[in-house]
């Protein structure tokens, strides 16, 4: 997470500078990656992914407005240029609060984001 204090962030930059070492040489089963804004760069660094699961954090947890389903699905499709669909998952880019102050969202708005993730995942992956 690149920060999640009252709907703000503290870091930006793509994964390219660390992608080869991080994705090719870390002995882990998966990566949870923030991709909810341009601050995270492109999906191209995912070319270094081997057999790990990649959880794409495409749904922002900073603001209550719901993302467009078709736009999110298009981003998932874009990521499949680098990682097979069966290795991809979808999630919010971070938890809904990294600090006790939280973000500028109500609990109902947070649950709407969770439902959106579920709906898109059902449409993209179905019963896989």
Region roles according to the model:
Residues 1-128:
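Domain-level signal for soluble alpha/beta catalytic cores
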């Amino acid at each position: 997470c690149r920060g999640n204090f009252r709907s703000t962030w503290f870091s930006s930059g793509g994964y390219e500078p660390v992608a080869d070492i991080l994705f090719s040489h870390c002995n882990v089963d998966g990566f949870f990656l923030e991709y909810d804004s341009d601050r995270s760069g492109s999906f191209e660094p995912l070319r270094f992914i081997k057999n790990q699961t990649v959880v794409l954090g495409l749904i922002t947890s900073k603001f209550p407005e719901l993302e467009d389903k078709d736009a999110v699905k298009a981003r998932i499709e874009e990521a499949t240029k680098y990682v097979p669909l069966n290795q991809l998952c979808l999630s919010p880019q971070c938890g809904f609060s990294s600090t006790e102050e939280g973000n500028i969202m109500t609990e109902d708005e947070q649950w709407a984001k969770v439902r959106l993730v579920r709906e898109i995942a059902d449409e993209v992956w179905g019963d896989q």
